[in-house]
Amino acid sequence: MDKLLKKAFVAAAIKFPSALFGMFCIFSVLVILDITIPAAATSLMNFFQPALLFIQRWLPLFYVPSLVVLPLSVKDIPAASGVKICFITAGGWLASLCVAGFTAIAVRKMVKTEMTDAEPMAKPSPFSPLEIWAWSGVFLVSFVVALLYRTALGTAARTCLPFLLASTVLGYMVGSGLPSGVKKVFHPIICCALSADLAALAFGFLSQSGLDPVLGYYLTKVSSNPGAGDVLMGFLGPVILSFAFSMFKQRKLVKRHAAEIFTSVIVATLFSLYSTALVGRLVGLEPTLTVSIIPRCITVALALSIVSFFEGANSSLTAAVVVVTGLIGANFVQAVLDKLNFRDPIARGIATASSAHGLGTAALSAKEPEALPFCAIAYALTGIFGSLFCSVPAVRQSLLAIIG
């Protein structure tokens, strides 16, 4: 469905994210079925449940390609600009967290809606030793084949795809199994990216081709000659489509706490977009780089669609900044929420997801399951509203005017 919509939107020259349109369609169908034939809506949800669990289990993996090819993305960025981007990323995360959290608390005090139990959310199964051994076998065999026969699968990128994909998956599996104390410093995504980079470095050294060409094979951005990163990023569209099911499942919660959720998410999203543009101009960051990091708090799946609205944006930098924002949130969100005295699960969930999207959500919900439904809703809505705002020409022009 994602690919069909993408082709249709390209053919019609429509700039709006096709997956987001598909998400709205799925959500509408589920709502209509729930009103007219409730059993059909339940059957549809049950039918897609395995796919939703698959996405939930592997979601962080789909963010990794931008980190793996980061050495290529930052090559032409001056060191001074890199420092400014880091400042905006870290400071922006904290500011967005505060804005979303304080807005949620203020609205909660006004509406005084009592919390009720949310719909339980299924958890994916942990990785088994058999899976780790299977992927290890794929890595070893495909690595040797790629070394001996550089174009065994037609092109160098296709030939390198199996071992680069296997190294990425293995890194994620190993990282996911680390003790929670280690994960705070060495997040599974970092482990995952390092694993892929080490595999690329080893292949580049043994084949005498160097690291850069192998990283180029990892993410080619050419559909006819995909690399491992292209395969993983191909799941970003289905991730957006899956938002429809999570929002439908928590529809009663959304309806009950609509004031807190929608107000906080809209305010936080607008603040994130415009504050990034303003601070980028104040610190003298190049306009093309500022444009590239505007959707820093929005999930990669939609952040890439947002920067496609702007000319000259570096999409690889966009993805990297979004992932780094999520990693900052994953490592520090709980401590910062405690320091800010945010005790309400709704405020904690919304603040986390609005500032650090899926990675922050995963980190907080692992220890505070009561915040997970609000994280999941805010995570989806932040991306949706960010895309909707940036699809409006007047909003894009105002952002560009601020950037200069």
Describe each PLM feature range:
Residues 1-71, 84-96, 121-248, 253-272, ...:
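Helical membrane-embedded segments and adjacent short helical loop/helix-boundary regions
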Residues 2-6, 75, 97-105, 109, ...:
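Short helix-terminus and kink motifs of transmembrane alpha helices
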Residues 7, 197-198, 274-278, 282, ...:
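Alpha-helical transmembrane segments of multipass membrane proteins
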Residues 12, 37, 75, 81, ...:
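Membrane-interfacial segments
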Residues 48-77, 117-130, 232-235, 289-328, ...:
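Alpha-helical membrane segments and immediately flanking helix-loop junctions
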Residues 59-60, 88-99, 271, 299, ...:
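Membrane-embedded alpha-helical segments of transport systems
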Residues 135, 171, 238-244, 369-371, ...:
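Membrane-embedded hairpin module used as a gating/binding unit in multi-pass transport
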Residues 218, 246-261, 278-286, 305-321, ...:
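Helix-loop-helix hairpins and the membrane-proximal interhelical loops
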